[in-house]
């Protein structure tokens, strides 16, 4: 595998400060193996390694920007005004296997997975000499390590592999990722698992996380650390992609129960307040520890959706009703024009400071759970139209013109069409649109142009075929990672 050097990062305290860590157990080549077998020999070192793993998760190369925004940028929801050159290759589908963004996502995704695997492997050896209190602490760390690895491998599978299910068609036998069950010995040849095996590994990690949270007596109860609600939410998302409707419904409800959320926020002022700061979103179950004092500045998601010139597409803007509170966070720079729009951040506005670079990424959120329950009810033999409508209404009431089930469609086909649009309206900037379009087998419109008109360079694009390339730097090392065959043929062609 390609030898990316794991820099010795640690997070002294999530949300408090990022500094360099001198522990050499993090100074290893991921995929080149473990330098020593007994490096993680104390609870304090486990804690340090776990914080380092969170740091890699939060990095702008992964969940802090690239791995999230790649789920929105090449879709019908985003608009690039052409004034800067960020993500432009992805947006315009002039994609190459040396793409910087894909390379960074691959690198940091595997940093998270590899470091988490080291922690998971090391913890059992510390149990024998640990006190009961220390065992509970180790169980908590183990739960979070499983959560981190599961999330990283889910993201890597979605980005670098085919969708596991596309409108009922199974692609689980297609090439998946290199699954990191245990740290890989130095210079060992590897191979890609199937997509199905990759998803099995993800589910196993999330289920193990829940088990160890229970054994630990609960989670930390802090938004910037993985906890039970977030993991249930990720299980729901994973099962949704697998079209396991009953499991998707039950885990989405488990997430809402664990977070003690039964309704959402309505009204312009209240909705806008959700995005005041890095901890203001009361609907969120997991967010990154990005703050006004510790952030990625020019490399932040907020910068991408403001001065780096991405904004909601004219198509997306047209989907909102006149009285939809979600448009309360849509604001435009003083230099913005209809033809050259300059957005001010949206969900990354960080209204308390007015600086989008300070904004966090809210990763797992309650509205997604209600929408999962709604969609799953339409397809599960145990679901009902009425239950789908009730779950959907909780989100759809963001538009104050919708007040009751009677304002929603009453047939499966029309209700599903509404859910598709509602996921666009609600989940914009959360990085889920690409996977929605692929799994629904939508004939997509991408590369929006000619604002303020609704116009796209590519239309009628079978986006479910889209597979990004594995970075050539990885493939060319000769450690066994095969390229996605014919990936370039899955890109859209001009009509």
Language model: regions and residue ranges:
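TPR-repeat structural position
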Residues: 199, 245, 383-385
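Short, surface-exposed recognition loops and adjoining beta-strand edges that mediate ligand/DNA contacts
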Residues: 37, 64-80, 160-177, 215-298, ...
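Conserved, well-structured interaction surfaces
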Residues: 86-160, 193, 210-214, 218, ...
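Acidic, glycine-rich segments characteristic of secretory precursors and extracytoplasmic regions
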Residues: 21-71, 273, 478-495
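Hydrophobic-face positions in mid-chain alpha helices that act as interaction patches
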Residues: 48, 225, 243, 249-367, ...
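Bacterial Sec-dependent N-terminal signal peptides
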Residues: 1-31
């Amino acid at each position: 595998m390609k030898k990316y050097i794991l820099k010795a990062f640690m997070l002294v305290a999530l949300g408090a400060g990022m500094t360099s860590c001198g522990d050499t157990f993090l100074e290893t080549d991921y995929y080149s193996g473990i330098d020593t077998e007994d490096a993680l020999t104390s609870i304090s070192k486990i804690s340090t390694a776990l914080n380092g793993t969170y740091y890699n998760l939060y990095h702008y190369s992964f969940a802090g920007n690239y791995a999230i925004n790649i789920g929105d940028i090449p879709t019908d929801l985003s608009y690039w005004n052409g004034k800067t050159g960020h993500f432009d290759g992805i947006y315009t589908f002039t994609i190459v296997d040396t793409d910087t963004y894909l390379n960074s996502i691959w690198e940091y995704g595997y940093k998270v997975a590899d470091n988490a695997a080291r922690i998971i492997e090391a913890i059992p050896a510390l149990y024998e000499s640990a006190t009961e209190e220390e065992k509970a602490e180790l169980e908590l760390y183990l739960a979070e390590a499983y959560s981190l690895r599961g999330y990283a491998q889910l993201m890597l599978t979605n980005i670098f592999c085919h969708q596991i299910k596309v409108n009922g068609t199974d692609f689980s036998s297609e090439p998946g990722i290199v699954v990191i069950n245990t740290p890989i010995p130095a210079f060992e040849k590897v191979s890609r698992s199937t997509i199905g095996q990759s998803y099995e590994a993800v589910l196993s990690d999330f289920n193990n996380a829940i088990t160890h949270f229970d054994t630990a007596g609960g989670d930390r109860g802090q938004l910037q650390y993985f906890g039970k609600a977030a993991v249930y939410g990720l299980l729901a998302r994973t099962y949704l992609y697998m079209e396991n409707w009953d499991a998707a419904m039950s885990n989405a409800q488990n997430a809402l129960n664990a977070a003690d959320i039964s309704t959402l926020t309505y009204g312009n002022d209240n909705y806008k307040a959700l995005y005041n700061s890095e901890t203001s979103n009361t609907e969120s179950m997991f967010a990154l520890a990005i703050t006004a004092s510790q952030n990625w500045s020019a490399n932040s998601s907020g910068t991408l959706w403001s001065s780096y010139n991405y904004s909601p597409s004219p198509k997306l803007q047209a989907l909102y009703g006149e009285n939809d509170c979600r448009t309360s966070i849509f604001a435009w720079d003083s230099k913005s024009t209809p033809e050259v729009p300059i957005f001010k951040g949206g969900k990354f506005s960080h209204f308390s400071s007015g600086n989008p670079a300070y904004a966090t990424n809210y990763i797992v959120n309650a509205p997604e759970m209600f929408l999962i329950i709604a969609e799953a009810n339409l397809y599960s033999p145990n679901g009902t139209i009425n239950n789908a409508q009730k779950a959907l209404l909780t989100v759809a009431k963001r538009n104050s013109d919708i007040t009751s089930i009677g304002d929603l469609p009453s047939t499966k086909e029309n209700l599903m069409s509404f859910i598709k649009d509602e996921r666009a309206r609600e989940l914009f900037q959360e990085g889920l649109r690409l996977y929605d379009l692929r799994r629904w087998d939508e004939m997509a419109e991408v590369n929006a142009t000619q604002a303020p008109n609704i116009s796209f360079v590519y239309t009628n694009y079978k986006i479910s075929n889209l597979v990004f390339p594995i970075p050539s730097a990885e493939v060319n090392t000769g450690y066994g990672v095969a390229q996605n065959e014919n990936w370039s043929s899955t890109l859209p062609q001009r009509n």
